[in-house]
Amino acid sequence: MAQNLKDLAGRLPAGPRGMGTALKLLLGAGAVAYGVRESVFTVEGGHRAIFFNRIGGVQQDTILAEGLHFRIPWFQYPIIYDIRARPRKISSPTGSKDLQMVNISLRVLSRPNAQELPSMYQRLGLDYEERVLPSIVNEVLKSVVAKFNASQLITQRAQVSLLIRRELTERAKDFSLILDDVAITELSFSREYTAAVEAKQVAQQEAQRAQFLVEKAKQEQRQKIVQAEGEAEAAKMLGEALSKNPGYIKLRKIRAAQNISKTIATSQNRIYPTADNLVLNLQDESFTRGSDSLIKGKK
């Protein structure tokens, strides 16, 4: 810039009169360039701007969207807000309904309400997040968590999260903030309470295991009783059958011999069984008498 001015000064006509004219031209051009530069500004994507003038303060009816805009230099200057949602993690220790200490952390996705930027600037300025979010999050967390016992905070986590989100969203509206998402990222208790919960769970598991073993023993006992009753009934029926017809035992021997014969017939080894191998005592006269009586009984 300085070099360009030197070159321009070298080309000016000599003499006091020419020097004065050139100087006026330079000053006029510089003033015009400065005025144009100060009269134009750009609002980037995801931003909004409001005007502050030195006489009336913040202009409540002017909210500028993205793009190129004009202003009156010195008299007006823009205040630009980023209206994109930004995440913030906030942790707060609080107490449950049964007086247990709870460490809870929230991830809050917030953005300013673009339609209320002038009033937000008057109340909170540009650092609205630092002024508002930590205080209202702590307030809502203490209010909601105090409604639940420590165990309910675990078993009803979805309900707790929904209640926190609803109350926090309504509270943020008072400060021209919009909350796009509120989620519980961490929920922990004191070491003493955690140890007590773990001990309780172990005791419950042991009790359930003992109950299972008792039920299993009872079931096995019932099964043995049923089996013994069945065997006793079978023995009783067999005794009655033998007392009524002695040939019944001979028939059982014949059927056993048939089963043995079938097994031997399908075997690869060649075996020639005898009557003794087939559990048949054919030389016993009682066998013949019992068989005859069984046949006559059927007739």
Swiss-Prot record:
Keywords: Acetylation, Cell membrane, Coiled coil, Cytoplasm, Membrane, Mitochondrion, Mitochondrion inner membrane, Nucleus, Phosphoprotein, Receptor, Repressor, Transcription, Transcription regulation. It is found in: Mitochondrion inner membrane; Cytoplasm; Nucleus; Cell membrane. The keyword Transcription regulation applies. One of its GO terms (biological process) is regulation of cardiolipin metabolic process. The modification Phosphotyrosine is found at Y128. Phosphorylated. Tyrosine phosphorylation is indirectly stimulated by IGFBP6. Disulfide bonds: none annotated. Transmembrane segments: none annotated. Residues 19-49, 150-174 are annotated as: Necessary for transcriptional repression. One of its GO terms (cellular component) is cytoplasm. Its main location: mitochondrion. The modification N-acetylalanine is found at A2. The modification Phosphoserine is found at S151. Residues 190-238 form a coiled coil. The modification N6-acetyllysine is found at K147, K200, K236, K250, K262. One of its GO terms (molecular function) is protein homodimerization activity. InterPro entries: Band_7 (IPR001107), Band_7/SPFH_dom_sf (IPR036013), Prohibitin (IPR000163). Belongs to the prohibitin family. PANTHER family: PROHIBITIN (PTHR23222), PROHIBITIN-2 (PTHR23222:SF1). Protein with pleiotropic attributes mediated in a cell-compartment- and tissue-specific manner, which include the plasma membrane-associated cell signaling functions, mitochondrial chaperone, and transcriptional co-regulator of transcription factors and sex steroid hormones in the nucleus. The mitochondrial prohibitin complex consists of two subunits (PHB1 and PHB2), assembled into a membrane-associated ring-shaped supercomplex of approximately 1 mDa. Interacts with ESR1, HDAC1 and HDAC5. Interacts with ZNF703. Interacts with STOML2. Interacts with ARFGEF3. Interacts with SPHK2. Interacts with COX4I1; the interaction associates PHB2 with COX. Interacts with MAP1LC3B (membrane-bound form LC3-II); the interaction is direct and upon mitochondrial depolarization and proteasome-dependent outer membrane rupture. Interacts with IGFBP6 (via C-terminal domain). Interacts with CLPB. LC3-interaction region (LIR) is required for interaction with MAP1LC3B/LC3-II and for Parkin-mediated mitophagy. This is Prohibitin-2. It comes from Pongo abelii (Sumatran orangutan). The gene is PHB2.
